[in-house]
Structure formats: C-alpha cells, structure tokens
Amino acid sequence: MSTKLQDHFDKITKILSGFGVEGCISYGEITFSIRDQRDIHLILKKLKKEYLFEQLTDVTAVDYLTYGQSDWQVGKVVSQTGFSRGRQQDFKTAAVDNRFEIIYQLLSMANNVRIRVKCKLKDAQIILVDSVSDLWSSANWAEREVYDMFGIYFNNHPDLRRVLTDYGFVGHPLRKDFPQTGYVEMRYDENLGRVVYEPVEIDDRVNTPRVIRN
C-alpha cells in the first residue's frame, strides 16, 4: 500500500469523523461506507467542499436479493443425489431490508485521488435517497439510469424519468427478480400498421446456472 494513498485515507477519515462512516483500503482503492442513507447528501457535499472532489464519475447500484444463492447444489450432497437442475427460482419480491446498495465514484483532480462511497438502503419500504445533482451536474443522467434500472428514487431530482428503457416500460431490468425474458414483447402488426406490445410467450428458464463453491 502506498503511503500517499494511506495519507489520503487518513485525511478523508478525519473529515468524516463526525458521521457514521466506515472506511477501508482494499486492492489499492479507497472505499467509505455510509451507515445512514439520510446522510448521503451532506457527506458528499462535505467531500466536494473540503477535499475537492470536483468530479462525480458515476452513480450505480447493486441488488443483493439473490446474493449467496446458487442455482445448482454443489458439495458433498452432489455425490449422493447428483446435481440439481437449473430452474427458474421463485424469489420473494417483498421488501427486503439492505437489498439495495447505492455507489458513488468520486474524483479529486486537485489531490489526484479517487474514492468510492457507498450506502446500503436499510429501509426497504422507502427506496429513496437525496439527489446530488445539485452538487454535480453529471448526477442528473446517472441517477435517472439508476432509477430506470433499479427503481431507486431520488428526492429533489429535477427530471426523474426513465432514460434507457422505452416509454411505458414495466419493471426495472437490473433487479434480480426481473425475468430475463421481460414481461412484454413487441412486433410489427401489418393490419394495424404499427408496432404492438404483447405478453411475452418465451418460457423463463436458467440456461447458465450460477454455481457457488464454498
């Protein structure tokens, strides 16, 4: 680990000492985890002002709904029963606390350092965080993409609309409970002279099963 990276980490940790934040250096990268999602805007504003993180390079999210679950059973049980077969799992789509994590990538050109700031959204009933588009204009479209793909809402966003999917699209494609086939398919209807949307007829199945070996 470089002493310069450690120096940046120590200085930023001191700046954030008054908040519920945990930091670490792993694989040559600095990461800070915010405990309370209500502090996201205030913490990022402080980082921009006091450590000159003038660029927000990305905002993204992770859905941990199926984290640690395997499509095939492996291990000692396999020798007795054989492999289980890949099949579409029925996930519980009810609200799950800590299911989503939002991630911000920041760059300080003045200090020549990048950091990652992330936060688990603990309240599954309210998947809402404050927008940081007032701090960085680049957050505008990035937050729209996170909303479109994951269904995470951003409070005080100036124009929170879908940005990647079509008008009237149902669901959020990067959620783990979103079917790989989607919900509808489209085709051109010669009689109507336009594109029509119909319920998808493809069976949703697992072609490449996820296997977790302990």
From Swiss-Prot:
Keyword Translocase: yes
Location of this chain's protein in the cell: Cell inner membrane
Database matches in Pfam families: Complex1_30kDa
Key words of the record: Cell inner membrane, Cell membrane, Membrane, NAD, Quinone, Translocase, Transport, Ubiquinone
Catalysed reaction, written as an equation: a quinone + NADH + 5 H(+)(in) = a quinol + NAD(+) + 4 H(+)(out)
Recorded superkingdom: Bacteria
GO terms under cellular component: plasma membrane
InterPro entries per the UniProt record, alphabetical: NADH_DH_suC, NADH_quin_OxRdtase_su_C/D-like, NADH_UbQ_OxRdtase_30kDa_su, NADH_UbQ_OxRdtase_CS
GO molecular function: NADH dehydrogenase (ubiquinone) activity; NADH:ubiquinone reductase (non-electrogenic) activity; quinone binding
Membrane topology per record: Peripheral membrane protein
EC number from the UniProt entry: 7.1.1.-
ATP-binding recorded as keyword: no
Function of the molecule: NDH-1 shuttles electrons from NADH, via FMN and iron-sulfur (Fe-S) centers, to quinones in the respiratory chain. The immediate electron acceptor for the enzyme in this species is believed to be ubiquinone. Couples the redox reaction to proton translocation (for every two electrons transferred, four hydrogen ions are translocated across the cytoplasmic membrane), and thus conserves the redox energy in a proton gradient.
Assembly description: NDH-1 is composed of 14 different subunits. Subunits NuoB, C, D, E, F, and G constitute the peripheral sector of the complex.
Family affiliation: Belongs to the complex I 30 kDa subunit family.
Listed name of the protein: NADH-quinone oxidoreductase subunit C
